[in-house]
């Protein structure tokens, strides 16, 4: 029987199948393979009586996060406030690249729109739009456009990420309920209080799942080579065939289709300048971690 792990704690994993949620233990073979089940894992279980079972197989993961430990994230909502705090464009780009690196669809949430007058013309909105990413305007405390956000959850395992103070917790509270955020769905069954250590879990919302703790707590990005970086800037794709050199880094090479597109305002200048700065950091540092 196939299911998805909603929560794991103390060696017990709570697996949702089409029928119900089973409390499962993992077979010893996983310990021998040094493989630990994670929230979000698709698994094969053998159910026993009284809603208990055993995890027999962990299906191949599409991706996984270290903090929080969650597998198979399919969509990330990158939350930034337009004011208090102001948008850090470099940090926003780092979140976008992190998602590209892990093959996670990105949707940018611009929160606190009431604090910024002409919010639709904010430079961050223009940059995200020019790069071809979806975005939503929010006033989370008053639930403005929250229904639009909810409609995008369906069929996905969703994580919310972004810097401190932008309203991630407010959004999560509105989506999954403050009580769930504080104690967790299954915590009540385990008689665990709200002041014990938090473990991430999946909460079902609008036929999708939401990770109940913010994701991407670290942004250490590792690349196999400096040539890899350009692959995570989606707006470069349609211009790379116009470059003279096959291995063009879109940096100092002559006759570069990407640089021409920047000069013609077909590629956002802020995005390109961030790319160049990051590429130079990788090259000058003699490393592929940034």
Curated annotation (Swiss-Prot):
GO terms for cellular component: cytoplasm. Binds 1 zinc ion per subunit. The keyword RNA-binding applies. GO terms for molecular function: GTP binding; GTPase activity; metal ion binding; rRNA binding. GO terms for biological process: ribosomal small subunit biogenesis. Its cofactor is Zn(2+). GTP binds at residues 111-114, 162-170. Zn(2+) binds at residues 243, 248, 250, 256. It comes from the Bacteria. The keyword RNA-binding applies. Pfam families: RsgA_GTPase, RsgA_N. Keywords: Cytoplasm, GTP-binding, Hydrolase, Metal-binding, Nucleotide-binding, Ribosome biogenesis, RNA-binding, rRNA-binding, Zinc. It is an enzyme of class 3 (hydrolase). CDD domains: S1_YloQ_GTPase (cd04466), YjeQ_EngC (cd01854). It is found in: Cytoplasm. InterPro entries: G_CP_dom, NA-bd_OB-fold, P-loop_NTPase, Ribosome_biogen_GTPase_RsgA, RsgA_GTPase_dom, RsgA_N. Its EC number is 3.6.1.-. Disulfide bonds: none annotated. Transmembrane segments: none annotated. Belongs to the TRAFAC class YlqF/YawG GTPase family. RsgA subfamily. PANTHER family: SMALL RIBOSOMAL SUBUNIT BIOGENESIS GTPASE RSGA (PTHR32120), SMALL RIBOSOMAL SUBUNIT BIOGENESIS GTPASE RSGA 1, MITOCHONDRIAL-RELATED (PTHR32120:SF11). HAMAP family: GTPase_RsgA. One of several proteins that assist in the late maturation steps of the functional core of the 30S ribosomal subunit. Helps release RbfA from mature subunits. May play a role in the assembly of ribosomal proteins into the subunit. Circularly permuted GTPase that catalyzes slow GTP hydrolysis, GTPase activity is stimulated by the 30S ribosomal subunit. This is Small ribosomal subunit biogenesis GTPase RsgA. It comes from Clostridium novyi (strain NT). The lineage of its organism: Bacteria, Bacillati, Bacillota, Clostridia, Eubacteriales. The gene is rsgA.
